[in-house]
Amino acid sequence: MSRIGRKSIPVPAGVDVTIDGQTVKVKGPKGELSHTLAEPITVERAEDGQLNVARPNDERKAKELHGLSRTLVANMIVGVTEGYRKSLEIAGTGYRVTAKGKDLEFALGFSHPVTVVAPEGITFSVEKPTLFHVAGINKQLVGEVAANIRKIRPPEPYKGKGVKYQGEVIRRKAGKAGKK
């Protein structure tokens, strides 16, 4: 991961980065994020305003954490400037989603509607009854919430019914062969 870790991180205008020991705080137009880095990794500000992630030695653990830490800090900067968004689609007869305030209510073939409460920092938007978006500034949280929603009714391989990411290709199976 050292090739990724060696790259410097550009800090755009309007983003304030505070480094306090192992804790990195990033504040931007969309919000504020903070992350505590693993022990051997340090972040320092270069003269040109960019951030550099450094490791003290070439031990295996330090090498593993070097690229990871650089990517996490870079994702925080992208999150507070642009944000992250995952789009999900619903396929199936009678399957749909509706917005109930900040939360989502799904009709997915169960005997009851399933309600998903929006965690702090996550916003839901429903474009169509079969297409909705999960958005936020924390990439990990956006992906986790989207994965938990998909887990409610994952797409099945025979008809493709269920909740899937937009653009996801579902491997289909042939149905059982009829009698001859």
UniProtKB/Swiss-Prot annotation:
User: From which source organism is this entry?
Assistant: Salinispora arenicola (strain CNS-205)
Q: Name a single GO biological process.
A: cytoplasmic translation
Keyword RNA-binding tagged: yes
Protein family according to the UniProt entry: Belongs to the universal ribosomal protein uL6 family.
Entry function: This protein binds to the 23S rRNA, and is important in its secondary structure. It is located near the subunit interface in the base of the L7/L12 stalk, and near the tRNA binding site of the peptidyltransferase center.
Q: Which domain of life is it from?
A: Bacteria
Q: Which molecular function terms from Gene Ontology are attached?
A: rRNA binding; structural constituent of ribosome
| Subunit record text | Part of the 50S ribosomal subunit.
Q: What is this protein called?
A: Large ribosomal subunit protein uL6
GO cellular component term of the entry, any: cytosolic large ribosomal subunit
What SUPFAM superfamilies does the database record attribute to this sequence?
Ribosomal protein L6
